[in-house]
Amino acid sequence: MLIREGDVNDAQVLAGLLGDLDYPNTPEAIAERIVVMAANPDSRLLVAESEGRAVGFISLHFIPQIALAGEFCRISYLCVSSESRGEGIGQQLLDEAERLAGDRGCDRMEVHSHTRRVRAHVFYARAEYEESPKYLMKKLTPR
């Protein structure tokens, strides 16, 4: 298993993986977002590759804190192809994300996971992630 930086050549596969999680996207839209992420030093996109084929990814965002020194790392998406689940790929991606966050001096990892994603909750609990205070959200209409 190879964990590498993602790039625009991964857009087709990432669009499919996100579609499997009910986030339908076009490869073109994903490619645009990959370019934006690649230009941001506080974002990382890691891809898991098996036998020359992308089978999963994790996207990370490093966020500075006002009340505490250092940053924390937020996982925005972690997806593994349905045929590759149960092979430890998600854990390998998470391990690499945690290593990168530690190298940057982050004091914690955060992930928000919808209540309906019960399997994801079990995965994160096995990785010693704890449920924390309530997460509140308000949807905005982009201008």
Task: Give the role of each language-model region.
Residues 63, 81, 85, 114:
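Residue-level recognition of the GNAT/N-acetyltransferase active site
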Residues 91, 103, 115-133, 138:
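Conserved active-site alpha-helix within GNAT-family acetyltransferase domains
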Residues 94, 101-113:
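Conserved GNAT acetyl-CoA-binding A-motif
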Residues 20-24, 87, 130:
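Residues at alpha-helix boundaries and the short loops/turns that link adjacent helices
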Residues 1-3:
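Extreme N-terminal starter segment of soluble prokaryotic enzymes
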Residues 5-70, 76, 139-141:
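Acetyl-CoA-dependent GNAT
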Residues 77-80, 86-99, 126:
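Conserved acetyl-CoA-binding loop-helix of GNAT-fold acetyltransferases
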Residues 70-82, 134:
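Conserved acetyl-CoA binding element of GNAT-fold acetyltransferases
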